[in-house]
A protein has these predicted regions:
Chain B
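Phosphopantetheine-dependent thiolation modules in NRPS/PKS and related acyl-activating systems
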Residues: 2-80
């Protein structure tokens, strides 16, 4: 095990999918401040990616933005090429990229499930497999999940099912990859105020309800989620493997 | 009958509340803040309803911008 003066610091290269907006952006920023060289992947929002790049340059943070479609072999190869080109130990993959169709069962189709699973589960699986030869002996895989993996939320059937599959996949990876020095865990944020809510029906009311139900009386912030992600990927968590850490202010402990 | 582009524009409006006048063949995701990965599947769902077609994962991958959306939809409509 490498020695750290600070067990929470990070090293090497880390890929953050969906790493230029919301929780992913917070993780990219925090990980770079903690010592990692971050490859922040995105697909559609050039403005957000360029804004992150500008901040990184201003603050001297080692963040590279990389536009790639994770659902395609070509996009996955782009990620792998970038990891190899970094020429540093590859120490982490954080899967924040996600999509989903928010519909009730009456409107949901198998194709909606296919679309949702393609990015949320399949792309993650393909990336892990492709990057396996690159992972350093002491590295981490972290998947960002949601409460919908274990709880029924309105209009969340497709996304929740995909997150449940993602969590099960991570547990199995944790067991299979541990002998290779790769830990795998899940981080489950509760309600966090990001742009993702724009696509969710009744967002305002549901966020207000989340605040009301939260024992800490507020939503969790992206920075708090990012700090937990850093912990799970750091040497301080070297005994944690195959676990799902809930970051929700205690909301899910309520009856 | 409205052109494919006009109906795509209508779907953008119902999905993202965009001004229909702003949607052209040159429109790309960066032009519309809500057109992210989540927005993309919402848009695809709306396009399926508007055009009464089925879009698979490969179609979604191909629909990188409005020009490609119109191309994919034209192909689907020709096959009907």
């Amino acid at each position: 095990m490498p020695q750290f003066s600070n067990p929470f610091e990070l090293r090497g290269t880390v890929v953050v999918t969906g790493g230029t907006r919301g929780i992913g952006r917070a993780i990219s920023s925090q990980f770079s401040r903690a010592g990692a060289r971050v490859i922040a992947n995105y697909l559609r929002d050039d403005k957000a990616a360029l804004a992150l790049k500008a901040v990184a340059e201003q603050e001297g943070l080692p963040i590279e933005i990389l536009r790639a479609d994770l659902t395609t072999p070509a996009g996955q190869q782009q990620i792998a090429a970038s990891v190899i080109a970094a020429n540093e130990p590859f120490c982490g993959l954080v899967h924040c990229a996600a999509t989903g169709v928010h519909k009730s069962i009456d409107s949901l189709t198998g194709r909606h499930l296919d679309w949702t699973f393609a990015l949320n589960v399949r792309a993650f699986f393909e990336l892990v497999k492709l990057l396996l030869p690159q992972f350093d002996r002491h590295s981490s895989v972290l998947a960002i999940s949601s409460m919908g993996a274990t709880h029924a939320l309105p209009h969340y059937t497709a996304v929740g099912a995909s997150k449940g599959a993602l969590e099960a996949l991570v547990r199995h990876l944790a067991a299979e990859l541990a002998p290779r020095g790769i830990r795998a865990n899940v981080l489950t944020p509760g309600a966090v105020a990001t742009d993702v809510w724009k696509a969710i029906p009744d967002a305002e009311a549901r966020l207000a309800e989340a605040v009301r139900r939260s024992p800490i009386g507020r939503l969790v912030t992206v920075e708090e989620v990012a700090l937990c992600a850093q912990f799970l990927c750091s040497a301080a968590a070297s005994g944690i493997n195959g676990q799902a850490l809930m970051v929700d202010g205690g909301t899910t402990i309520l009856a | 009958m409205d052109s494919v582009l006009a109906r795509v524009s209508k779907t953008f409006h119902s999905t993202f509340e965009t001004d229909p006048q702003l949607i052209t063949l040159d429109t790309v995701p960066g032009d519309i803040p809500a057109w992210d990965s989540m927005g993309h599947v919402s848009l695809a769902s709306g396009l399926e309803q508007e055009f009464n077609v089925n879009l698979d994962v490969d179609d979604l991958m191909a629909m990188e911008n409005v020009r490609e959306i119109v191309r994919v939809l034209n192909e689907k409509l020709e096959r009907k």
